[in-house]
A protein has these predicted regions:
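A cross-kingdom marker of C-terminal helix-rich interaction/assembly modules
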Residues: 1-210
Length: 210
């Protein structure tokens, strides 16, 4: 829930890009919950194998960059790497692989869309570019103007991700959906549907949100 609160706080001050990065994290959390609901302990074991391999990889990275350590620390670390060399055989997890064949598989499309804003892509950096001056030199706007439609889209996606988490946790607990949760889902669908109406004449692929 800390992510949700942070998204709201960022939205209130117009930090859309930063909010979208956190919404992306919310979707990733929903993938894990959905997979846990689907595969239970089997997925828990996959998570453990993933963590083992990543720990060894991080350890190997320290040696590759020849970071300076105290002799005793380096000796213990090398021994740890030797004792856990079998951890390299584990499989690593990816968001796309985790969400595959789960109840929220289609939401990976939104995650992929948000991933553009989580990296220094040309799309992301273009937010800060101003038209070129008379000498052909582009300008930089460190505080680009807020785009209300993008902020609304971000909050809409955040609601979608949070609902996925709530229903996933409900499945993990093997509980019946509460009336409050059902009402929230119905309200979201109604708002999302209403938000699409003004954009019926837009080009295919665009989404309207409310």
């Amino acid at each position: 829930m800390s992510h949700v609160k942070a998204v709201r706080a960022l939205a209130k001050v117009g930090r859309t890009l930063e909010a979208r990065i956190l919404v992306r994290n919310c979707f990733e959390n929903s993938f894990y919950v959905a997979r846990l609901a689907k595969d239970g302990n089997k997925f828990v074991m996959e998570m453990l194998e993933d963590e083992k391999k990543r720990r060894v990889a991080r350890g190997q990275l320290l040696f590759e960059h020849q970071l300076v350590m105290e002799d005793e620390t380096e000796s213990k670390f090398r021994q740890w790497m030797k004792d856990h060399k079998d951890w390299k055989k584990g499989e690593t997890l990816s968001p796309k692989g985790i969400v595959s064949k789960t109840s929220v598989e289609k939401s990976y499309v939104f995650y992929s869309e948000l991933s553009v804003d989580a990296h220094p892509s040309t799309d992301t950096l273009s937010r800060y570019l101003l038209p070129a001056d008379e000498q052909g030199r582009p300008g930089i706007d460190l505080e680009p103007p807020l785009k209300p439609e993008e902020l609304i889209d971000t909050l809409n996606l955040n609601a979608c991700a949070v609902l996925g988490i709530l229903f996933g946790v409900n499945d993990v607990m093997e509980a019946e959906a509460s009336q409050m949760l059902t009402d929230l889902a119905n309200e979201y669908q109604a708002l999302e549907k209403r938000g699409r109406k003004p954009t019926d004449k837009q080009e295919d692929g665009e989404r309207g949100v409310q």
